[in-house]
Regions:
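Glycine/serine-rich loop-strand microenvironments at binding/catalytic pocket rims
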Residues: 1-13, 100
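Core beta-strand elements of the Rossmann-like FAD/NAD(P) dinucleotide-binding domain
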Residues: 6-9, 183-187
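N-terminal Rossmann-like FAD-binding beta1-loop-alpha1 element of flavoenzymes
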Residues: 11-38
Length: 187
């Protein structure tokens, strides 16, 4: 029989992309007494999509742009396939997120001569909406998020691939996740 190592945590986050790292930061800030674990199939911030972002982060900051226009560009660009409630939430919270990325996480984005954030339009956008750091926006965001997470008491499981969800007794929710440690082959 294969021996399985057991670890307990209060909050388990799978993935160390932008969403995973933001989740870890928000969980730790909201409930610092809880044990938070970040599990990633590779190395923290060396895998995932966020680090590959070249374009930037879309946010309606005025100058003729609105959250409504951002939302419609998102829906039309997605050929009406996006979940509209989620798309609205994404567009509506974008100003809050860009402020958080700059003021709390420490990201630096390109600026106009007057000091305002530089924005440019990408395919399908009806306004200059994309905040960026040259063409390395993803690396800027993921690097600053990683710095913040590494400063906090968040357990990190690197090179651990989730291979099965373990349902809770009664079928309501999950009681665990089965991982394989990619370095050792152990569960």
């Amino acid at each position: 029989m294969t021996e399985i190592e057991r670890q307990d945590t209060d909050i388990l986050i799978l993935g160390s992309g932008g969403a995973g790292l933001f989740a870890a930061l928000h969980a730790q800030r909201t409930a610092p007494e809880l044990k938070i674990t970040l599990a990633v199939k590779g190395l923290i911030c060396k895998c995932g999509c966020t680090r590959m972002v070249q374009g930037g982060y879309n946010v309606a900051l005025g100058g003729g742009d609105t959250v409504e226009r951002h939302f419609m560009d998102t829906i039309i660009g997605g050929k009406w396939l996006p979940d509209q409630d989620m798309a609205w939430r994404l567009c509506n919270l974008a100003v809050e997120r860009i402020t958080e990325l700059e003021n709390e996480v420490g990201c630096f984005f390109d600026r106009n001569p007057d000091g305002s954030l530089h924005q440019k339009a990408f395919a399908g956008q009806t306004a200059d909406r994309t905040v960026h750091k040259g063409d390395l926006t993803g690396i800027e965001i993921i690097s600053r998020l990683m710095e913040q997470v590494l400063r906090r008491p968040v357990e990190k499981l690197q090179e651990h691939r989730a291979i099965a969800f373990i349902p809770a007794t009664g079928g309501e929710g999950l009681s665990g996740v089965l991982f394989i440690d990619m370095r050792t082959g152990k569960f």
